[in-house]
From Swiss-Prot:
It comes from the Eukaryota. Usually encoded in the trnK tRNA gene intron. Probably assists in splicing its own and other chloroplast group II introns. It comes from Nandina domestica. The gene is matK. Keywords: Chloroplast, mRNA processing, Plastid, RNA-binding, tRNA processing. This is Maturase K.
Amino acid sequence: MEELKGYLEIDRSRQQDFLYPLLFQEYIYALAHDHGLNGSILYEPIENLGYVGYDKKSSSLVVKRLITRMYQQKHLVFFDNDPNQNKFVDHKKNFYSQMISEGFAVIVEIPFSLRLVSSLEGKDITKSHNLRSIHSTFPFLEDQFSHLNHVLDILIPYPIHLELLIQLLRCWIQDAPSLHLLRVLLYEYQNWNSLITKKKKNFSVFSNENQRLFLFLYNFYVYECESIFVFLRKQSVHLRSTSSRAFLERTHFYRKIENFIVVFRNVFQTNLWLFKDPFMHYVRYQGKSILASKGTPLLMNKWKYYLVNFWQCHFYLWSQPDRIHINQLSNHSLDFLGHLSSVRLKTSVVRSQTLDNSFIIDIAIKKFDTIVPIIPLIGSLAKAKFCNVSGHPISKPAWTDSSDSDIIDRFGRICRNLSHYYSGSSKKNSLYRVKYILRLSCARTLSRKHKSTVRSFLKRLGSKLLEEFLTEEEQVLSLIFPRVSSSSRRLDKERIWYLDIIRINDLANHS
């Protein structure tokens, strides 16, 4: 953002009207590729495309030609003798659109970034990086969900039509050429709907090509879906809620246009009394969201069908009611962010002593509990070829070409990261099985590499292998509690939420 301020001397009140000319500035592509502002990002592609003779710092002509070629209809030329030539011709057209989309992704974020900075000026929360952490959600759930009764488990509807997405962006960006260019880019990538559905194969293609643009569009679409919660929250609660404000800071877009507020105030003013619930809490991660309340099942059913009608009328999306499940927190485990969370009744015995008599009172306290889901973890380990579907450890043949220390470090890093992520769970017995699978898989991989037996490697590297699979908190607790039994019992009860986890990596690719 600091780099943009040095180059973008645009009036904030009119900056959304002048986005298209920024597409011809070379530093935009330098920012998109993170190559710095002094390097020439288009230097090598210019030579490859036959633009020799032009100044490599003057990119306007290059960008114009890229846009022209992207607009032109091209047909594939098939060569019978050279199948690789076909891929080259097809890749050349994708290269033009990819170059433009990478620069366009930086430009389209400018109005939202500047609006974000202006809306959060003078607030201390902008200096906090802990809200970026995934684990920052769980302390909020522990504080709030233990007092709630019901929860709506929501899957965000998909897919949205491309033209409707552009119409929604038109409310924020009044630059017509930029919107026309975005329309061309979206139709160049026919797999846009696959991004919404989170299909792994198609999503991996986008993550390698234009992750920034499509994640921006997806976040904008999700924000539009969530805008109704912000509006109803402001209408039902006159005092600004700190927890609600903290939720808003964890998203990328914070304000809704005034026209939206006016329309909903006029249309739904008579029905707002149905949804006045001061104990409503909302949490989202990726395509799944949670709406919890202290209200009755009747109120939750009203919310369910209200959301279905809202998405259908505002986005022209048919969201099936079965994508929203109503569950009671006391007898249902919530699958969210890889944890199984629920609200359990914990009974504590209190002894009251008087002058004459003593009384023993059983007090039931609601407690938010999180456990480690062992079945999904074993499924992930089996997918990554660390074990079979039954959880039996197997060797990792793909890693046998690495050195012994590198193999041990890879297995140990995965084990430590899993322990680090599930450090806030109240019951960690499942992690011991995961550690056993990874440790024995590591030993099988080493024995396969050296054509030896697993027993010999466990005897020779037993202590080193054990130290590598210890987490940092285990090492600290082992120093405080020398006895292994007391340390294990203390570690099983210890709950630590780390605020340095900002994303979840795929276990199969985390090496």
